[in-house]
UniProtKB/Swiss-Prot annotation:
Biased composition (Acidic residues): 74-88, 171-181
Keyword match Nucleus: yes
Family as reported in the entry's similarity comment: Belongs to the CBF/MAK21 family.
GO biological process: DNA replication initiation
Organism this protein belongs to: Xenopus laevis
One term of GO molecular function: chromatin binding
Name listed for the protein in its UniProt record: Nucleolar complex protein 3 homolog
Tree of life domain: Eukaryota
Length: 795
C-alpha cells in the first residue's frame, strides 16, 4: 500500500501577498511581546543573581565547628575490666578483645544518650556543604567595602553600579601612619640633577621637535585620508595645542594651529551643518546616514573647540598676563597671536559658508584697528577678500555691522583704514547688473487661460514639465533670489550711509572725514533722492569752511557730481559753486605735491564736463581746456599724459573749442588767467601756446599727445593717435605711465646717438699769444702761501 500523500502545500507567493495587514501586525506584536518577555525574564535573573552576590558579600562567614571527641570507653568500664580474669588470658587475646570492644559501638555506648550514633557526621557534612556554597577568598585579597553608585539604563533595563573600596583595619592604618611619620622624619639625600650643556639642550630640542612634527603629520594624514573614520583623531591633534614642553611649546603650538586650519579647509563640507531635531534623533536611520551624522557632529564640536582655542590665545596676548607662564613666555605670545589671526583670517575667507562664520567675523574685523601692524594688515587684507568674494551679501552685511558698531563704540576714534574697507563692497556691481536686467525685455508669464488658448495639449504638458524641471534645478543649485540679494544690499547700504552721516554730523574734524567723502563719492549714485538736498548743503558748508585738505575738497566735488549724474538728473540744480571751486584749485596739482590727487581730479573732470556735456557752456569748456594745458607744464609726465588725454576728449566733445588753436582773438576783452570764474575769464581770446613747449618734452608720449592736439585732435589721418593710446581713458593712461615704482615707460635706450660737432679754429694774433704765454709762465713760477694769511686773520 502506498503511503498517503501529504496534500498540504506551501503557500504561494500570491497567497502571501493576500495576507491581511491586521494579521501581519498581530504577528509583529506577538514577536515583540516574546522578545520583551524573554528580555524581562533575563533581567529578573540578573537582578536575583546580583542580590544573591550582594547578600553573600554583606554576611560575615562563620568559623567551622570543632568536633568534640568522646572520652575513651575504657574509663567508664574500669570496674568491669578489673573483674575479668586477665591472668588466665594471653596478651594476644587481651589485645584482640580491646580492639573488638572499640568496634562494638552498639554495646559500649551510653543508652541514656539521646543523640543518634551518626549525628555528628551529618552535622559535619551540613557545615561543609554550607561553606562550599559560599564564595571563597584568598588570603592575599583584602576586605573591600561596596559603595553603591548611580545606576545605568540601557536597552535591556536598569543596571545597578557598585564600586569596591578596600577596608583598612585600624591596626594597619596606625602602622601606615607611623611609617609615614618615620619617612617624613628621615631625610633622604636627593641626587643632584646633571646640568645639560647648550649643545645637549639644542640636540634634545631638535629630537623632540622632530618627534612632534612626525606625530602631527601622521595624525593629519590619517584624518585627510579617511575623515569619517578618523574624526576622533582631530581631538588628539587639537590636544597638542596644550604642549607643555617648554623647549618646543611655542613651535609645536604654531604648527598644530596651521595644520588644523588646513585640515578643516579640506574636510569641511560645502554646506552648513544644522543641529538635529528631537524627532530626527529618535528616528531610525540607515547605517551610512548614522555614520555621516556622527562625522558631522564630531566635526562641528572640534571646529568649535579649535576656534575657542584661537580666541583664548588672542585674549591672553591682549591682556599680557602678569602671571608668568613656565611654558610660554610673554614675548612668545605675540608670535602665537599672529599665527592665530592668520588662521582665523584664512578660515573667514575660505569657509564663508560654514558654521560659526559670523563669530569669526566678530573676532577678525575689529583687529583692523589694532596697534600691531602685522595683525592689522592681516585682518585688513582678509576683510577685503571677503568683500570681493561675497556673492550673496550675507558675509558683507555681517562685516559692515561689526564695522559700524566698532566706529560708534569707539566714539569715532578709529583708524581711517577701518572705513576704507567699505570701498571694497560689491554693491555697485550688483546694482549695475540689476539695472541692465531691468532694461532688458522680461519674459511674459503665461496664465492658464493663455496656455489653454495658445498651446495645444501636448505643448501644455511639455510646458508644465519644463517649469517643474526649472524649479528643481533652482532648488538643487540653492541659488539666491534677486529680491533677497537686493534686500541684503539695501540693508548693507543703509548701515554704510548711517555711519557716514553720523560722522558728517558729529565728527567733521575727525581723521575719518576723507574716508567718508571718498565712500560717499563711490556710493553717491545709490543714495535715496530724499537726502540729496541735505547732503549737497553739507558739502557746500564743508568746502566753504576752508578746513578741508586738497584731497578732501576734491572728494566733496566728486560726491556732489556723482549724486547729480545718477538719480539726480531729475533735479534742476546748477552746481556752479563746485565748478568754480575745482577751476580755482586745479593749480594745487604740481610736481612737488603728491601724484595721487591727479587721479581724483581726472575723475572729477570726467563727471563734470564729459558726462554732463549738455549742461556745460562753451565758455566753461574753453576755460577748463586752457587751464589744463597750462597745468600740464607743471606736473609729472604721467599726470601730463592724463591731462592731455582729458583735453583731447573735451576738444572732440566740444568741436567749437578749436578756436584756441588760432592766434586771432575773438570778441571783446583779454584773457584773465588769474580770475577764478571760468565763465568770465575770456578764454576765447587766448591760444594754446603751451602745446609748442610740450612738443619738446623729454617724455615721448607727451610729445605725441601735444602734436596730436596741435593738429586739432583728429580721429583719422596723419595726426591721429595710435589705437593703443586713443582707446584708453585718461585714468587708464595715468595708471599705465605711472612712475610710482621709479620706472620710466617707455624704457630709456642704453645707447644715445652722439652728434658730430665740427671743430672751430680761432686764429689769434702773434702778440696776443705771446702775452698769454708770458702771463701763464709768471703765475706758475710764483710761490703761493695761504697759511700766513690765515694765521694773520686768526690773530
Amino acid at each position: 500500500m502506498k503511503p498517503m500523500r501529504n496534500r498540504k502545500q506551501a503557500p504561494s507567493f500570491r497567497k502571501l501577498l493576500k495576507t491581511s495587514k491586521l494579521k501581519l501586525d498581530n504577528k509583529l506584536k506577538n514577536k515583540q511581546f516574546k522578545q520583551e518577555s524573554s528580555a524581562k525574564k533575563r533581567r529578573k535573573e540578573q537582578k536575583q543573581l546580583r542580590e544573591a552576590v550582594r547578600d553573600v558579600r554583606s554576611k560575615i562567614p562563620k568559623p567551622l565547628e570543632t568536633v568534640k571527641k568522646k572520652q575513651p570507653v575504657e574509663e567508664e568500664y574500669e570496674v568491669e575490666e578489673e573483674s575479668l580474669p586477665l591472668d588466665m588470658m594471653d596478651e594476644d587475646d587481651v589485645q584482640l578483645m580491646k580492639e573488638m570492644a572499640q568496634r562494638a559501638s552498639f554495646l559500649t555506648r551510653d543508652l541514656t544518650y539521646s543523640e543518634p550514633v551518626h549525628a555528628n557526621k551529618r552535622k559535619r557534612d551540613d557545615v561543609i556543604n554550607k561553606y562550599e556554597k559560599m564564595p571563597r577568598k584568598s588570603k592575599s585579597e583584602p576586605e573591600k567595602e561596596v559603595i553603591h553608585l548611580l545606576p545605568i539604563k540601557d536597552r535591556h533595563g536598569i543596571i545597578p553600579q557598585t564600586m569596591e573600596k578596600p577596608v583598612i583595619p585600624s591596626e594597619e592604618q596606625e602602622e601606615n601612619e607611623e611609617e609615614m611619620d618615620t619617612e617624613h622624619t628621615e631625610e633622604v639625600p636627593e641626587e643632584p640633577l646633571r646640568i645639560m650643556t647648550t649643545e645637549e639642550l639644542l640636540v634634545h630640542r631638535q629630537v623632540t621637535l622632530e618627534q612632534r612634527k612626525t606625530h602631527i603629520a601622521t595624525l593629519a594624514s590619517a584624518i585627510l585620508s579617511e575623515p569619517e573614520n578618523n574624526i576622533r583623531k582631530l581631538k588628539e591633534l587639537r590636544s597638542m595645542l596644550m604642549e607643555q614642553d617648554p623647549s618646543v611649546a611655542v613651535t609645536v603650538r604654531k604648527l598644530v594651529m596651521l595644520s588644523l586650519m588646513e585640515v578643516f579647509k579640506d574636510i569641511t563640507p560645502s554646506y552648513k551643518i544644522r543641529p538635529l531635531t528631537e524627532a530626527e534623533k529618535a528616528a531610525r536611520v540607515k547605517k551610512d546616514t548614522q555614520k555621516l551624522r556622527e562625522f558631522e557632529e564630531g566635526l562641528i564640536s572640534q571646529y568649535k573647540f579649535y576656534l575657542e582655542n584661537l580666541e583664548q590665545i588672542l585674549k591672553d596676548w591682549k591682556q599680557m598676563k602678569t602671571k608668568k607662564s613656565e611654558v610660554v613666555s610673554l614675548h612668545a605670545y605675540k608670535g602665537l597671536a599672529e599665527i592665530a589671526v592668520k588662521c582665523l583670517c584664512e578660515l573667514m575667507v575660505s569657509l564663508s559658508h560654514f558654521n560659526f562664520h559670523n563669530n569669526i567675523i566678530v573676532l577678525v574685523v575689529p583687529l583692523v584697528n589694532d596697534k600691531c601692524r602685522q595683525i592689522s594688515e592681516l585682518s585688513m587684507e582678509a576683510t577685503r577678500k571677503l568683500f570681493r568674494q561675497d556673492k550673496f551679501g550675507h558675509a558683507s552685511l555681517a562685516a559692515v555691522k561689526v564695522i559700524s558698531g566698532l566706529v560708534k563704540s569707539r566714539n569715532y576714534d578709529v583708524r581711517p583704514e577701518v572705513l576704507q574697507l567699505l570701498l571694497h563692497l560689491r554693491i555697485k556691481e550688483v546694482e549695475v547688473k540689476k539695472d541692465t536686467e531691468d532694461i532688458a525685455p522680461k519674459q511674459k508669464i503665461m496664465s492658464y487661460k493663455d496656455k489653454k488658448k495658445n498651446l495645444s495639449r501636448m505643448q501644455r504638458k511639455w510646458k508644465k514639465a519644463e517649469e517643474k524641471l526649472e524649479r528643481e534645478l533652482l532648488e538643487a543649485e540653492a541659488s539666491e533670489s534677486k529680491e533677497k540679494k537686493l534686500k541684503l544690499n539695501t540693508e548693507t547700504l543703509n548701515i554704510v550711509f548711517l555711519t557716514y552721516f553720523r560722522i558728517l554730523k558729529r565728527a567733521q574734524k575727525s581723521v575719518l572725514l576723507p574716508s567718508v567723502l571718498e565712500g560717499l563719492a563711490k556710493f553717491a549714485h545709490l543714495i535715496n533722492v530724499e537726502f540729496f538736498d541735505d547732503l549737497l548743503i553739507v558739502l557746500h558748508k564743508l568746502i566753504d569752511s576752508g578746513d578741508l585738505t586738497y584731497r578732501e575738497s576734491l572728494h566733496c566735488v566728486q560726491t556732489a557730481f556723482n549724486i547729480l549724474s545718477g538719480q539726480g538728473d531729475v533735479l534742476n540744480i546748477d552746481p556752479l559753486k563746485f565748478y568754480t571751486h575745482l577751476y580755482k584749485t586745479l593749480y594745487g596739482l604740481h610736481a612737488g605735491a603728491t601724484n595721487d590727487d591727479t587721479l581724483i581730479a581726472l575723475q572729477c573732470l570726467d563727471v563734470m564736463l564729459t558726462r554732463r556735456r549738455r549742461q556745460v557752456s562753451q565758455q566753461r569748456a574753453l576755460a577748463f581746456i586752457k587751464r589744463l594745458s597750462t597745468l600740464a607744464l607743471h606736473v609729472l609726465p604721467d599726470s601730463s599724459i592724463g591731462i592731455l588725454s582729458t583735453n583731447r576728449v573735451l576738444m572732440q566733445t566740444f568741436p567749437k573749442t578749436d578756436l584756441l588753436l588760432d592766434s586771432d582773438s575773438q570778441g571783446s576783452g583779454i584773457y584773465l588767467p588769474e580770475l577764478d570764474e571760468p565763465e568770465y575769464c575770456n578764454a576765447q581770446n587766448s591760444a594754446l601756446w603751451e602745446l609748442h613747449t610740450l612738443m619738446r618734452h623729454y617724455h615721448p608720449v607727451v610729445q605725441i599727445f601735444a602734436a596730436h592736439l596741435s593738429a586739432g585732435a583728429p580721429s583719422e589721418g596723419s595726426g591721429a593717435l595710435k589705437a593703443e593710446l586713443s582707446r584708453r581713458s585718461a585714468q587708464e593712461l595715468f595708471a599705465d605711465y605711472s612712475i610710482k615704482e621709479m620706472t620710466f615707460n617707455p624704457p630709456v635706450s642704453e645707447s644715445v646717438p652722439k652728434r658730430k660737432t665740427k671743430s672751430r679754429a680761432f686764429d689769434l694774433s702773434e702778440d696776443l699769444e705771446q702775452l698769454i704765454q708770458a702771463q701763464l709762465e709768471k703765475v706758475s713760477s710764483l710761490h703761493v702761501d695761504f697759511s700766513s694769511c690765515i694765521k694773520a686773520q686768526s690773530v
